[in-house]
Amino acid sequence: MGKNVVVLGTQWGDEGKGKIVDLLTDQAAAVVRYQGGHNAGHTLVIDGEKTVLHLIPSGILRDNVECLIGNGVVVAPDALLREIAKLEEKGVPVRERLRISPSCTLILPYHVALDQAREAVRSEGKIGTTGRGIGPAYEDKVARRGLRIGDLFNPERFAKKLHELLEYHNFVLQNFYKVEPVDFQKTLDEALGYAESLKPMIADVAARLHELRKQGARIMFEGAQGSLLDIDHGTYPYVTSSSTTAGGTATGSGFGPLYLDYILGITKAYTTRVGSGPFPTELFDDIGAHLASKGHEFGSTTGRARRCGWFDAVILRRAIEINSISGLCLTKLDVLDGLKTVKLCVAYRNAEGVVIEAPTDADSYVGLEPVYEEMPGWSESTVGIKSLAELPANALAYIKRIEALVGAPIDIISTGPDRNETIVLRHPFA
């Protein structure tokens, strides 16, 4: 029987999941997105050519790999079709290999308007949303009033539901946020205009996954964002609106947890975060600026600069627990090349003493200071190294210390952005 693997982020997103999914799909029959929307930004570098994907699974650049968008994803049809067009310009036959669940909730213009209006009026406590309508679309889904992709193929029903929704949302936009309403007819015409382009790609994704399972095919599930942004387990309220942990795989695809064989957690060799929210190891000095510059820490979706800090074993231990991580992939090790010393956060400290467990909400991080272990750095370059034996001794010691601190094996080490710049110690599909 085939093996089924989940790849997800263990920090606050931007860990390098796209590259690893692309690398591992040489042995997969299908890749599935199961949560999030086009707020994700997965960067792939293949033979020096960079591709950024937002909605389409990262397996799309591998010939003959099926790419599936599960019911847990919220879809902006205009953004999806633009992404398809860009890939087709590069000669990628997207429409032949992409299948989308009709149960995906749609992101429509009023979701974007609400998202941006809310963030604009927050005087403090800004969430740091991408402003792309993700949160409001999930709100409609949970409130059981969301429009789904399948609704596009029944124009009369779609128009009726849209009219009711716009009455509600426009009232909020005009009376609470004091902004212009969203036009019904324009929204209706645009949405129904997408139906013809999307229809050939619509399929029962859950049924297809179980077909593949029965055939013994290998399936990969590609997470977006990171575990500490999970709506339930993240640094609430500075989180995304979907289930970014391994549990979201089942609910967002219709593929039960019993069939998942290996969960790969992606973690940077340091820590980053975009937008607001707690970040105990954040650096405001030259080292932080160095990590941001050398690591090219700018969001692939928003272009926003990422906050940078030392590696945090406390949050990684929590991510390992809530995801049942089988093994880790350590990315961007090369960014630490040249530093005289490197630090790892092993615990936090507050007025009451030492804290070894990650808090369960943002407010509980207030007053926490990191407790660091310091290790010697390495002057040698790790860029492009493909075997453990070639690593500098101090870099290897750093890796081994992370394994000891978090209690999980590091099975893959990324030493550069290209898919070939990788050390694979244990293949998830093996």
Curated annotation (Swiss-Prot):
Cofactor remark from the record: Binds 1 Mg(2+) ion per subunit.
GO-annotated biological processes: 'de novo' AMP biosynthetic process; IMP metabolic process
UniProt KW keywords: Cytoplasm, GTP-binding, Ligase, Magnesium, Metal-binding, Nucleotide-binding, Purine biosynthesis
UniProt pathway: Purine metabolism; AMP biosynthesis via de novo pathway; AMP from IMP: step 1/2
Record carries keyword Cytoplasm: yes
PROSITE patterns the record matches: ADENYLOSUCCIN_SYN_1, ADENYLOSUCCIN_SYN_2
Residue sites binding substrate per the record: 300-306
EC numbers, comma separated: 6.3.4.4
Binding residues annotated for IMP, in chain numbering: 14-17, 39-42, 130, 144, 225, 240, 304
Residues bound to Mg(2+): 14, 41
Binding site for GTP: 13-19, 41-43, 306, 332-334, 414-416
Any one Pfam family match given in the protein's UniProt record, by short name: Adenylsucc_synt
Gene Ontology CC entries for this record: cytoplasm
Swiss-Prot/TrEMBL catalytic activity: IMP + L-aspartate + GTP = N(6)-(1,2-dicarboxyethyl)-AMP + GDP + phosphate + 2 H(+)
Cofactor: Mg(2+)
Compartmental location: Cytoplasm
InterPro entries: Adenylosuccin_syn_GTP-bd, Adenylosuccin_syn_Lys_AS, Adenylosuccinate_synth_dom1, Adenylosuccinate_synth_dom2, Adenylosuccinate_synth_dom3, Adenylosuccinate_synthetase, P-loop_NTPase
Residues annotated as the enzyme's active site: 14 (proton acceptor), 42 (proton donor)
Subunit structure: Homodimer.
Family under the similarity heading: Belongs to the adenylosuccinate synthetase family.
Role summary: Plays an important role in the de novo pathway of purine nucleotide biosynthesis. Catalyzes the first committed step in the biosynthesis of AMP from IMP.
Name of the protein described by the UniProt record: Adenylosuccinate synthetase
